[in-house]
Each structure stands twice: as C-alpha cells, then as structure tokens.
Regions:
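Bacterial Sec-dependent N-terminal signal peptides
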Residues: 1-26
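Sec/Tat-exported extracytoplasmic proteins
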Residues: 47, 51-59, 72, 79-83, ...
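Short secondary-structure junction motifs
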Residues: 85-89, 120, 176-179, 209
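Acidic/histidine-rich catalytic neighborhood of metal-dependent amide-processing enzymes
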Residues: 100-105, 133, 143-225
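A non-catalytic alpha/beta surface segment that caps or lines the substrate-entry region
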Residues: 58-112
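Soluble non-cytosolic domains of exported or imported proteins
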Residues: 34-44, 59-70, 119, 142, ...
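Acidic/His- and Gly-rich active-site-bordering loop/insert found
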Residues: 50, 76, 97-139
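N-terminal hydrophobic or amphipathic helices/low-complexity stretches enriched
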Residues: 19-67, 72-82, 120-122
Length: 225
C-alpha cells in the first residue's frame, strides 16, 4: 500500500507540474501516518470490491466485468467527474472464431484542464478492468475449478486510477491539460478495449500528449501476484 501512495504522489506531481516535470520524493520517508488515511481505506475498499468472489475473475465479456464497469462508473460519478460513457459504459463487440460476439465495454471519465491554451490537449490515465476469469484443471484425478480473482491484476490499477481521479478532481484548478480516465474492457489478452478507444470512441487522438497505464501495481518488486 505504501508503494501505491508513492506512485500516486509521483503521478500527481507530473500532472500538476507539467509533462516535463520530475517528481521528487524522499527515500526512507515514514509512511506510518498513511496507514489509516482516507486514501488507503478507499484503495482497500476498491480492491476488495473489484476482486470479490462475486466478480468471478472478471473475464472479458462476463457478468463480473460488467459489474466492475458499473462500480467504476458509480465511483467516478460519486467523485464528481463527468462520465462520458453513460451508465452502461461504452459498449463494443468482438467477433469470436466461433462466430459469436463477445460484448465488452469501456468506462470513460473526464476532467477539463484550466489552461485555455492547453485544455484541448489530453493526458489519458488508464487501467484494464478484465482479468482471466476461471478455468478447470485435474489434480489427482479430481476436477478443480480455479478463479483468478485479480487483486493485483488489475484491481490494484483500477483502485489507483479511481483515487487519482478523486485527488485530481479536488485539485482540478491546478491542471493545465484535460485528463481522461479510461477503464478498459477486454484488454487483458487482446487489448480490444484500448484499441476501440483509440480507433472508434475518441476522435482527437492527435491531441493526446501522454498516456499513463496503471497495471498490476500491487506488489512492487516482491512478486507477480
């Protein structure tokens, strides 16, 4: 959790200081005062909700992915952002080899920059919503179902994006460029949600100055999951 706070602070420094700013923070600083902070509590709540058993691993096109999109939409709205994708998300379809269509969605929220010369330039902050879902394997002749709940992949990135949106909304008067927050559907393996955003949903791609992708930020260098 301390690592998440450091990353959030660094990203805020870059956004408030401009694209070329360098974020600086002390090594070895004490984070004890952050243990019970509002941000830490919110991060834990987001991760717990998004990686809950009811989400069933959030496989692309699943009910769990849809419920995650609904949750992200609700939080963006509660935090005071303009949700551009509507209550159902920005829905798109993916044709499968079987001929069936997989239905997924992106969630897009917006904060307008305050600089008249820069507000039509954009920084995109994104995180994928979907994970691997579940599968079955045979152990000692017994079929066992495994669910990949995805606390790190990628509930951690979504949680950080949501809290960044809250912080930037609170301090929006310091923003020069506008910021787009995008929770990508069907992007764990095929990157379909990010492709759809760039090629179908957002027309001002040339006005994007930077993109920050938040993916699997929950463990640092200590592990993969």
């Amino acid at each position: 959790m301390k690592g998440k706070i450091t990353i959030i602070s660094a990203i805020c420094a870059i956004l408030f200081g401009g694209i070329q700013a360098n974020a600086q923070f002390r090594n070895g600083a004490s984070f004890a005062d952050l243990d019970d902070s509002e941000t830490v509590r919110a991060l834990k709540e987001h991760v717990s909700t998004i990686s809950a058993a009811v989400m069933e691993g959030r496989k692309a096109g699943s009910e769990g992915e849809r419920m995650t999109a609904e949750y992200v939409t609700e939080v963006f709205g509660r935090y005071g952002l303009d949700v551009l994708s509507g209550k159902d998300g920005d829905i798109f379809g993916i044709r499968q080899e079987s001929g069936d269509t997989l239905t997924s969605r992106n969630v897009i929220a917006f904060l307008q920059g305050g600089d008249k010369a820069l507000r039509n330039r954009y920084i995109v902050i994104g995180a994928r919503m979907d994970n691997l879902g579940s599968d079955t394997m045979t152990i000692d002749g017994r079929t066992v179902e495994r669910t990949y709940y995805g606390a790190n992949g990628n509930a951690s990135g979504l949680a950080m994006m949501l809290e960044l949106s809250r912080m930037l909304r609170t301090n929006r008067q310091l923003l020069g460029r506008s910021v787009l927050f995008v929770a990508f559907g069907a992007s764990c393996q095929t990157f379909a949600g990010s492709w759809y955003f760039l090629n179908r949903a957002f027309s001002d791609v040339k006005e994007i100055d930077a993109m920050i992708n938040l993916d699997m930020v929950g463990t640092g260098s200590s592990g993969f999951y």
